[in-house]
């Protein structure tokens, strides 16, 4: 049994409340949790962006706007926990320490944002360190890491494997797939480098792709690792 930390983008799980993918993700998360310890960090998605946009129009400062966004991530996390039922720990973890403690239950642990100015990708990267994860997975809207935005550059190169240093180089150039806010931010990339925990980046718009990649090694994805040790399937 391995420990897996998932950064599940809000734009993937709940792009819009009426167009959420929660039902489709339930059997996928349960299948993975049947074989491994699973921690999920949920992003804010369209809901968080909408609230933050309104807050800015009202002249609310950035720190408070971030706190509003964090509340939305926790609301999304609460919805996922309720939908998972007995498979999940019944409370949203509000710190890395809480998440680690809740993990002792062997149930799926779900959390949202923690600190203003920090993305849920960064939260997940630190959580991976705290729980000594075997793999950190970023579930996003593209099938891995590219040297340029593949949506605007058809000839962009997909990286099946790369080192943490190569990842940082791409992030610092602003060339991560659909945009660093959708694939990985630079803080999370730095944490990946220091932790030496393998990172997997995959497309989560088709939920079953997550279990296919992690449990069966099927599909297209990117692996960031400081060693040549085989990461997938788990």
UniProtKB/Swiss-Prot annotation:
The keyword Nuclease does not apply. Keywords: ATP-binding, Cytoplasm, Kinase, Nucleotide-binding, Pyrimidine biosynthesis, Transferase. Disulfide bonds: none annotated. Belongs to the UMP kinase family. GO terms for cellular component: cytoplasm. Catalyzes the reversible phosphorylation of UMP to UDP. It is an enzyme of class 2 (transferase). This is Uridylate kinase. It is found in: Cytoplasm. UMP binds at residues 44, 66, 114-120. One of its GO terms (biological process) is 'de novo' CTP biosynthetic process. Pfam families: AA_kinase (PF00696). Inhibited by UTP. Pathway: Pyrimidine metabolism; CTP biosynthesis via de novo pathway; UDP from UMP (UMPK route): step 1/1. It comes from the Archaea. GO terms for molecular function: ATP binding; UMP kinase activity.
């Amino acid at each position: 049994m391995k420990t897996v930390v998932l950064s599940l983008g809000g734009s993937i799980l709940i792009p819009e409340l009426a167009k959420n993918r929660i039902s489709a993700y339930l059997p996928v998360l349960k299948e993975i949790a049947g074989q491994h310890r699973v921690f999920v960090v949920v992003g804010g998605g369209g809901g968080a962006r909408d609230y933050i946009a309104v807050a800015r129009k009202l002249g609310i400062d950035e720190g408070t706007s971030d706190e509003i966004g964090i509340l939305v991530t926790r609301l999304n996390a609460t919805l996922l926990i309720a939908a998972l039922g007995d498979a999940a720990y019944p409370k949203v973890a509000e710190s890395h320490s809480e998440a680690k403690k809740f993990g002792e239950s062997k149930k799926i642990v779900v959390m949202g944002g923690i600190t203003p100015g920090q993305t849920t990708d960064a939260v997940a990267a630190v959580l991976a360190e705290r729980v000594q994860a075997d793999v950190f997975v970023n579930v996003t809207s593209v099938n891995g890491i590219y040297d340029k935005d593949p949506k605007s550059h058809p000839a962009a190169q997909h990286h099946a494997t790369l080192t943490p240093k190569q990842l940082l180089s791409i992030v610092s150039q602003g060339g991560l797939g659909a945009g660093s806010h959708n694939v990985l931010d630079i803080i999370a990339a730095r944490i990946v480098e220091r932790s030496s925990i393998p990172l997997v980046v995959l497309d989560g718009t088709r939920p079953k792709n997550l279990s296919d990649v992690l449990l069966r090694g099927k599909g297209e994805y990117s692996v960031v690792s400081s060693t040549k040790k085989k990461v997938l399937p788990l």
